[in-house]
Amino acid sequence: MAAPSELQLYPSVIHPAIQKYWDEFCELPAETLSAFSSYYPDILRAFAVSDFLALNILREPELVLSFLQSSQHQKECQLVDFRAPLAEELSGALKEDDLLRILRLFRRRMMFRIIWRDLVCLVDYQVTTREVSWLAETCIDEALSWIYRDMSQQFGEPHSTAGVKQQLVVLAMGKLGANELNVSSDIDLIFTFPERGETQGGNRSLDNQAFFTRLGQRLIQALDNTTADGFVFRVDMRLRPYGQSGALALSFAAMEAYYQEQGRDWERYAMIKARAVAGDIDAGEELLTSLKPFVYRKYIDFGAVQALRAMKEMIEREVQRKGQDGNIKVGRGGIREIEFIVQVFQLMRGGRDVRLQQRNLLSTLECLEDEGLLPVAAAAELREAYIFLRNLEHAIQGLEDKQTQEIPKDEEGRERVAVAMGFPGWGACRVQLDKYRDCVSEHFADIIAERREAPLERPDTIEWKALWAGRLAQDEAQDLLLRSGCDQAQEIYEAVTQLRQSSRVQHMQLQGKERLDEFMPNLLQSLAQSRASHETCRRLLALVEAVLRRSAYLALLNENPGALTELIRLFAESAWIARQIVTTPLLLDELLHSGSLYTPPDTTALRDELRQQMLRIPNDDLEEQMEALRYFKKAHVLRVAASDLRETLPLMKVSDYLTFIAETIIEQVVDEAWETMVKKYGEPGYEDAALNDMRFAVIGYGKLGGIEMSYGSDLDLVFLHGASGDLSTSGETSIANQVFFTRLGQRIIHLLTTKTASGDIYEVDMRLRPSGNSGLLVSSVSAFQQYQEKSAWTWEHQALVRSRAVAGCPGIRAEFEKVRKDILTQHRDPAKLRTEVMDMREKMHASLGTKPDSSGSPPYFDLKHDRGGIVDIEFMVQYAALRWANEYPQIVVWSDNIRILEALGDAGVFSQEDADKLCDIYRLLRAHGHRLALQNLPARIQTDELLEERRWVVAFWEKVFAE
């Protein structure tokens, strides 16, 4: 059967897609086709605008026909229209498989109805978002009720210590909280409960925390897990206190304490839309009322502008990094900018004007207009733009029922989106989109965006343009370079000429070539004026070559002359930094923000920044998570290196920050790995059923453990767990605890070490675990303790001196620290200890020390391994710690060499003068090592350098190990 004549109403580029679905549709029985005949125009439109609708029509034609004949597509639903039918269907669910199947089929039916009405009937977007929100709310609440009843049969019902019955409260954040959920969106939830206590009336009792955690886990699985019937909603729990490392469910008291003591500005922003959607709704709303002082300040909070500005800046960096200019949510002039405009007024003035304490954006926008906080015209323009962008968002997502805000890259996809929006084609739609985005961007700049200085007018660059274009003779070009302050004119001229004549430059596309022709004169002039060497020029030209096919970076430098100045300075001072930026040009973005470039954030800010970045990545997008972690590390290590070069950070702070970066990443990786494993296998079984936290910890050894990391340090790690190996996990696919923790450890290593296009994050060395490479990847704390007491070699106890817990469960970390203290403070035979430490040092020196050259003398001094170097000092520290910690346990409180040396001086083991001298030399040697690392050079110096210090260390070694 030929397609109806209405096919000609659609752009020709999408005819093949419509025809394909139409041909399959025509294979339905004649009786079915006849029943559909009066709906052919709508069916054709559905095929044109949505693969999701088309596939459901072909999969379940009878259901779709019933939907159309009952006129459900012509009327709005109320909340009861979702709740009543789902509650009835679930009343017959006898087991969890029934629950999962019913939820998914119900979601599919209702989502078909909603998307049909949105894209075929073109209903108001607010109707669509309200109905999607009601669907989600219904699925959450009904699933929670079913699982609660099921668990109560086994454990009884939770009660407070005063005997009051308790229920879980599910808080919806973001779009769901505001009843503004998209047609294909995940749901951001937080689980909480009123009071601590325990269950009553079941076969065995659980404390409330454990009960509600298990309840929450099962609820997530019921909604999020993908089965043969699909999923219900993707669930994101990362907005809860402490993020992925936090407890899945917290009491009201713990929630209030967290937000009062540790709440961040971006969490205030997130809490604006929070709403209780399931469980004890009344109690949930009482909790949110108690949290309002955290969100809305009594004074006019001008600091909110800067906080949102920082959030927007972070998002802009990600948009640039990921090339998301076509993203209508986070891109320029997108939905997020409108949200920020509205929410900055809410955060600033909501404490003084309760009318602004609303969840719905358009309602709040109306209040801002009424209160005179936004001009009438601006409010109208923002409202119109917001509605357009939200409708466009639905059109994009409705194509395949996928959570995306990216304009389709292919022509067919764009045309289908335009049709869904009611336009004759993408051209007309794009004109309207650009108009709205320009308008939003203008208003955002007026209200929130930080004013940036216009690029400085450069002096006349005619000569430099002529040099780059090859219009100057060689002697003229070299004379220009010399006159401008460059004393290696010939080498630079030859390098520039070679680049200009290269095939890669000759075959550049027009836009890229124009950007290069604008950039190169500026670069050459800046190089000459900074008296840059040929080596600096070579490094910068390597960068230019690296970005020839990604000329947006050249545009960035053209528009930001200050960034070019910083670039030349850093490339001149550090070969290592130059190499980092050449291999990862995305780091150029860091140069735009000189304030943060030379002031690395503290540990709290580091964790906060990484958490915000990871929150914007879907839970199941492992590739993007890994890329984000790699960029985070590189960007922050670059900041440390820049500060190191400028000497705004002393040596110890450099190592501190490099260590903080590693710890922050490890914490995030552990949380990501744990969440993935628990989702797949359930939580490990514990002999104490009340335990429900991670019970896993990462121990750092070596440079990480000693808080002494350098730019190229790897991670020496040991993994410990606190669960019985005889028990198994709680998931449907259950595995033994030991298998679970082994796979968890493997996944952590995989996330840290897998090489992507951006490289790895860190190299990981696990050889310091009990029994080394032949031992278990993850040991229990008790097995670790037994090994250290009965089997460990002296060198392993030396390594333990520089160890500390860096991530994971606080309880397991505390257990490790106790084991460490007990082992290090044991009494040891001094003579045996002395012999074993000296023997190990001799072996290391024989293996790693510098060998004499043909003249019989060493050609250089290895800062780390040669006599009088870093390892000698570390061995003396470890020997003294093991020798004297039994008598002076304060010696091993810390794991870093400097503080151990200070403790040895305070205890009188070393004289104060000797301890101070060793600290000074240790810092000096490490500072030389850092400087060499920043030049991509090995840790070696000339044999006549630092002679006095090296000889002093050798002499002190003899004194320490004298019999």
Swiss-Prot record:
Record keywords, A-Z: ATP-binding, Magnesium, Multifunctional enzyme, Nucleotide-binding, Nucleotidyltransferase, Transferase
Protein's UniProt keywords contain Amino-acid biosynthesis: no
EC top class named in words: transferase
Gene name of the encoded protein: glnE
Protein name: Bifunctional glutamine synthetase adenylyltransferase/adenylyl-removing enzyme
Xref: HAMAP family: GlnE (MF_00802)
EC number annotated for this UniProt entry: 2.7.7.89, 2.7.7.42
Organism of provenance: Hahella chejuensis (strain KCTC 2396)
One GO-annotated biological process of the protein: regulation of glutamine family amino acid metabolic process
GO molecular function: [glutamate-ammonia-ligase] adenylyltransferase activity; [glutamine synthetase]-adenylyl-L-tyrosine phosphorylase activity; ATP binding; magnesium ion binding
Catalytic activity: [glutamine synthetase]-O(4)-(5'-adenylyl)-L-tyrosine + phosphate = [glutamine synthetase]-L-tyrosine + ADP; [glutamine synthetase]-L-tyrosine + ATP = [glutamine synthetase]-O(4)-(5'-adenylyl)-L-tyrosine + diphosphate
InterPro entries in the cross-refs: GlnE, GlnE_rpt_dom, NT_sf, PII_UdlTrfase/GS_AdlTrfase
